[in-house]
Amino acid sequence: MGLTKTLEEYIKMYEKHTKEKFQFNTSFSFFYHPEHGFCEYKIEDTGLYIWQLCGDLKYWVDIGYKVCQQFQLPAMSAYILRHSKPFIRKLGFKIVKTEHEDSYYRFTCKNKAGEELVATQHGDKYIFVWKIEVKDNDSTDV
């Protein structure tokens, strides 16, 4: 069993790193895990949307992939308030294309499986969008 934190401890950590006051977003569902942090999310036809997140990013992204597969969602996006390049590396992606225009950067990334992630920076905020290859849930393969 890993290191656990209370929700209050994760919220303090979130506020310290983001320099923003944490407030529950009533438009999103909320999930907390003592070893992995917390995540606010919303499921819509167009994809899975992750709003406020603190803790183990890799854990929450892995959960997100599973949710996208289960509900056959084509994309997952996350709002990130920290520098994007360390997150890109931690998630196993490499930047294959960089675009810069005015006050934003966009990084197109791929991982070893060929999956795509686009990270767009505007000021200090980042939007990560993963394209999800939906697997056929009706497959009879054993």
Task: Give the location of each predicted region.
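A conserved beta-strand-loop-helix scaffold within acyl/acetyltransferase catalytic domains
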Residues: E15-G47
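Short secondary-structure junctions
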Residues: E20-K21, F28-F31, G92-E99, L117
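Secondary-structure transition/turn motif
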Residues: Q52-L57, N111-K112, H122, W130-D136
